[in-house]
Amino acid sequence: MNKALQAALGTALTAAFVLFAILAEPAYADVLLTDLVLGTSAQERGVAIEEMPDILATHAIIMRPDGSVYYEREADSPIKIASTTKVMTALVALDHCDPSETLTVDHAAATVGESCVGLKEGDTLTLEQALTGLMVMSGNDVATAIATHVGGKIDPASADPYGTFIKAMNDRTAQLGCTDTLFENPHGLDFGAWVGNLHSTAHDVTRIWAEAWRNEAFRSFACSGATEMHVTSADGSARSLPLTVRNKILGRDGNLGGKTGSTYEAGECFVCTFSREPEGEVHIALFGSKGDEGRFNDTLTLANWYYGHFANLPFATSPKQVGGVPLAAEAACVDWSDKLMDLTFADADAAARVFTLGGTIEQKVEVDELRGKHAAGTAAGSVTYTQNGETIGSVELTTANELEPPNLLEWLAVQLDRLVRLFEDKPATAEERIYATMPDPLSIDEWNA
């Protein structure tokens, strides 16, 4: 083999090796340590990159029904929100109208364009059917028809019922404490004739979703997998319209329901609710994802991240055992100079459900000094567990054996021993020992199991 060929082969092998090394490294291109966990950046918390979700979405949030936020990515930045706008459309409609009411489709609704269920001018349908088409298939035509009908109910004297409805959307937004949201239409279109300043934030959209989710009627539409809706044509004939379920993870891995959205500026959007035991429900919203599959993959990643970072933290942990149970501590028996009493956990199964990225978990062991007679199982201390300074649980410590005080001869021997200890500068009684330990929470959660 000539030298030129050898050199070329060597260069090729080196390049292949480097490429293999690069590909072998885990890719975290969409994992950001600037993302917030419980309001603090992952970097400030010292959270390892592998503990964070890898998502394509540019804006995202995970929020509990009580409003506590567990994860944020640019959640308070103003963005286009596409058809997640329709969550507020449904909420305002249910605030002011009964689902059994009948509405009529006008020319504006029938010709709005883009994602539509196929309504025609003059069609009539119940608000219930309209809300089904709104939440299941994201119909812009039903959104417009709803706005005109409900606006007329809000202010029968208004010459612009559509505008009245938009004002009601923004008034409701203010009531919910949203910080940066403006609605300009009931469907979320943001291009062509609809170019404007309609915007919100991931946080605000989730606030709106959480409020709507409290409404039982809204949940029935948001959770619906209906494949058709029913209308009456202008000539009085009944007509069924096929529906495509936009939420492709409905019923999967705990997804109870949601609302999709998509425009060029907003990207792929989704706001939804999951429920998995024992944590229960949580709301998730994301915006600016890539492609329909990417949107739902991101959503499932966030759900798995949230639920995967909860774990049962066992309290009764120790490197030592006595009688087959964990040894928590040894307590000083003050009537004796050299005796210690084994203390075990009163409830060996005691545990607390914790969010493993929620901050430092600490234990405080308090051991009583024992004097006199004690039966086995006597309370003799406790271990209290805190996370970020808040108590998450405690467990009582009890004596593993009986304790008898010294008789007269034993007492004299103890006094003599203490005299010797005094000259040797040793303590008059044996010193307590602590064996209870705190497991690393991240070692027991399911995120990277």
Task: Place the predicted regions along the sequence by residue.
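Hydrophobic alpha-helical membrane context
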Residues: 15-18, 98, 310
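Catalytic-site microenvironment of enzymes
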Residues: 22, 70, 449
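Active-site-adjacent loops and short helices of periplasmic peptidoglycan-processing enzymes
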Residues: 29-216
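Domain-terminus/edge residues, biased toward the C-terminal soluble/receptor-binding domains
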Residues: 196-449
